[in-house]
Amino acid sequence: MADRVLRGSRLGAVSYETDRNHDLAPRQVARYRTDNGEEFDVPFADDAEIPGTWLCRNGLEGTLIEGDVPEPKKVKPPRTHWDMLLERRSVEELEELLKERLDLIKAKRRGTGS
C-alpha cells in the first residue's frame, strides 16, 4: 500500500516544504559584460570571492563590470621539437651526428649501386 502512495512522486528531487517564513542565504550579485556588449548577472554567496571573469551562456567570457580587473594570463611560447632537441644536445653534437648519418647513407648507396 505504501507503494501506491508514493507512486508518481519524485523522491528527493522536490521539497514539499513551503518557502514562506524562511530566510534565504545572503547573496551578492555580480554583473559581467562580454566583448559583444551583452551584460548578465551571476548570484554568489555573500562571503564568496567573486572571480574577475565568468563564462556567459552564449559561450563568450564576460569581464566583471564593477571590481578588480583580472590579470592577463601568462602565455608561454610553445616548445618546439627543435627546442627540446637543443636541451639535450649542442649544435656541434647535432652537426657531428648529421655528418655520421650522411656518411652512413652514402656508404649504403655505394654498396648497393655497384
UniProtKB/Swiss-Prot annotation:
Induction: Constitutively expressed during growth, increases slightly in stationary phase (at protein level). Monomer. Forms a complex with the RNAP catalytic core, specifically with the beta subunit (RpoB); its binding site may overlap with that of Rif. May bind free principal sigma factors. One of its GO terms (molecular function) is bacterial-type RNA polymerase core enzyme binding. It comes from the Bacteria. InterPro entries: RbpA_sf, RNApol-bd_RbpA. Keywords: Antibiotic resistance, Transcription, Transcription regulation. This is RNA polymerase-binding protein RbpA. Belongs to the RNA polymerase-binding protein RbpA family.
